[in-house]
A protein has these predicted regions:
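A preference for well-ordered globular domain cores
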Residues: 1-128
Length: 128
């Protein structure tokens, strides 16, 4: 019975971790004070596009976030994408550590009280 309850709490807490991992609390940055996010595929695609623009001797690019247009220096956007990729990687590591901690926990109260929001890096903030 106790193991059944422990597994139930673990499943619930695991779902909460996964929901938190995909929320704006984790998947966001600010640009000029406005929340935004670029998923992995978009970040990779942007790096490719920016390299092509750079090869064509362009200095600036147009970036659209949440319906707002930003005309930015290509090198600046590439630097921003590096920061975002490192942030996303660190968030991934924190999430995986939380999932591992929950999976390996044997105490019901510790699972119930587990704080899955701790340990995440500070959201990147860019002002351009």
């Amino acid at each position: 019975m106790k193991d059944n309850l422990l597994n139930k709490y673990k499943a619930k807490k695991t779902a909460l971790v996964k929901d938190y991992d995909t929320s704006q609390a984790v998947n966001s940055f600010t640009l000029n004070g406005k929340l935004a996010w670029l998923d992995k595929a978009t970040r990779v695609g942007l790096v490719n596009s920016l390299q092509i623009e750079k090869s064509a001797n362009r200095d600036t690019t147009t970036l659209w976030l949440n319906g707002e247009q930003y005309i930015l220096n290509i090198d600046l956007v590439l630097q921003m994408l590096v920061v975002l990729e490192l942030y996303a990687k660190e968030c991934y590591n924190v999430t995986e550590q939380h999932l591992n901690n929950i999976a390996n926990e044997t105490d019901l109260n510790r699972v119930y009280n587990y704080n899955y929001t701790k340990g995440y890096p500070e959201r990147p903030a860019f002002n351009v």
